[in-house]
Amino acid sequence: ELGPNANILVLDAGDEFQGSLFYTQYKSGPVAEFINGIGFDAMAIGNHEFDDGPAELLKFINAAKFPIISGNTKIADGSELKDKFKGYIIKDMGGQKVGVVSVLATDTGETSSPGDKVSFEDEVAYLKGAVKELQDQGVNKIVLLSHVGYVRDQEIAREVDGIDVIVGGHSHTLLSS
């Protein structure tokens, strides 16, 4: 067991709502209950979190006991998701300010059901601004919790200065040493 001063982030890159008979039968409530016990520091919204529309995602967000983030996901006025999640979090870890920022694939409107009040800003454009905003707040360690896929993660790594680590999802690409 890790001590209380362990400098560890527990992150989820999204897509908890897909691929199992369990989710198909029971939806987000039991999923939230189960993963609340894991102790995540943050979770990215994946495209499949929108599979049953914004209302089911809202139920999950309300049940979650950890921050759910997605910075380039833009919510229009009148949506039940308005102001329900942030683009990033800042954690104090061993006296260091660590930022965790998240983006979601811009084609989510085609791969899922986000509804007409949800749109997706270009990942690189959003991240350049978010990294600067985090750095302006004294953050010098930035983790990207990404749900855009391995190829896009590599492009982001080349195009956005200031990101130290990318924890990526979406493409389900196995990386080994």
Positions of the model-derived regions?
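Acidic, metal/ion-coordinating pockets
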Residues: 1-177
